[in-house]
């Protein structure tokens, strides 16, 4: 679906509004499937098992529903305003998932984690629920650098058991973070047969998408999303980027608790 068409549909859907931004803040847990690119900018796609989890307590929280699998502590600063610290899972980049990386003998970036801080604001503008989330993350491996993201989401539709929302997100990275994913050292250049490339700091990627859920009963629901992501900044010009835009989708069965 082209971007203008998706935006027109989102605007039309504002007539009946969902109850909560990011569909809900209900506690839930369950299994899911995700279809995604091998890495942002890859032509190869892969399907993987992912958790569907959300528990927003005080002080503890854990969730996978805001684009990152994260857990930590948070505190309430005011009505609808929370600040916290988190540990997050960082998926890395595996050459075996990408025909391009494998054919050029590019090394893996191992799965890792990060430490960070976040601020989140939930508010209703009339009947429209909105969530704004800002996060900063520093990889455990100092060579993997720092990232910051800003995410906005809103509920836009509810009819019977079906709810939907939209979201947009932008991610910035310092030079180490961008270069670790998209840079090519002179040594790697010789092995891979690709030109050496050094990526700098700045905007890394932007994305927008659709969130949806279907209630199956008081305790069970199906949740999912559709996402379109674009590689930006220095990363966009890397020889490792086969496509500047990627699509992903996920769906899962969750139990409310």
Where is each model-derived feature located?
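Short amphipathic alpha-helix initiation/capping segments at coil-to-helix junctions
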Residues: 198-206, 213
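Hydrophobic core residues within well-ordered beta-strands of beta-rich domains
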Residues: 27, 49, 81, 115, ...
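Short glycine/proline- and aromatic-enriched beta-strand/turn motifs that initiate or cap beta-hairpins
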Residues: 21-68
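Cleavable N-terminal export/targeting peptides
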Residues: 1-26, 42
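Residues on the lipid-exposed face of transmembrane beta-strands in outer-membrane beta-barrel proteins
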Residues: 31-35, 51-57, 71-75, 117-121, ...
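Outer-membrane pore/translocation modules
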Residues: 62-165, 175-201, 227-235, 239-245
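Predominantly the C-terminal beta-signal and adjacent terminal strand-loop region
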Residues: 166, 208, 212-257
